[in-house]
């Protein structure tokens, strides 16, 4: 399975209860290295990813974006894999979140089997919450990570695997979306 929480290395790294800023809270705002990051998990065999792509590299701000990848079970026995899709606004402000889990696809693979997996991201998946509580999608570039874990150095060190980072561009004006 995959972790639904982040494990800090030490309790001293946890923010004070009286500090309500998001800095270092949850995997989305963490600046230090986690002991075990959100989404981390191992399996009894080897899973490989290949051919990651988006169906559209440029789209209107409110359009859906579909990402696809091939997932292969390199083992001699059946496995389940959770394909994780994270999104990050490339020009995010320092107080805005980094990569956020926005899609997941669970796939069952027989020994040696390969399947193509698609995840569709909607406008809300690209949105950010503003200071005044609005929910907006901005034009600009977004990074989409697809793989079996959260993107980042610690995940790589623990699993020996990389995620693929794709870039898509949203064009048009900033748009409000439902929270």
Predicted features along the sequence, with ranges:
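Short, conserved secondary-structure segments in the cores of folded domains
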Residues: 55, 103-105, 133
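Short acidic/polar inter-strand loop motif in beta-rich domains
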Residues: 125-129, 149-154
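Secreted, periplasmic, or luminal enzymes acting at the cell surface/secretory milieu
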Residues: 1-80, 86-88, 139, 143-147, ...
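Intrinsically disordered, low-complexity Pro/Gly/Ser/Thr-rich segments with frequent PxxP/GP/PP motifs
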Residues: 93-129
């Amino acid at each position: 399975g995959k972790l639904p929480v982040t494990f800090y290395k030490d309790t001293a790294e946890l923010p004070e209860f009286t500090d309500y800023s998001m800095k270092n809270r949850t995997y989305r705002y963490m600046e230090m290295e986690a002991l075990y990051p959100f989404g981390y998990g191992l399996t009894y065999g080897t899973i490989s990813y290949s051919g990651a792509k988006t169906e559209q590299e440029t789209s209107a701000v409110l359009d859906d974006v579909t990402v696809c990848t091939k997932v292969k079970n390199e083992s001699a026995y059946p496995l389940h894999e959770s394909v994780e899709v994270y999104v990050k606004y490339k020009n995010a402000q320092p107080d805005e979140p980094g990569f956020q889990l926005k899609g997941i696809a669970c796939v069952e693979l027989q020994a040696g089997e390969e399947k193509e997996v698609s995840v569709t991201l909607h406008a809300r998946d690209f949105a950010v919450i503003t200071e005044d509580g609005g929910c907006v999608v901005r034009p600009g570039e977004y990074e989409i990570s697809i793989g079996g874990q959260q993107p980042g150095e610690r995940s790589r060190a623990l699993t020996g695997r990389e995620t693929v980072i794709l870039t898509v561009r949203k064009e048009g004006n900033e748009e409000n979306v439902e929270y």
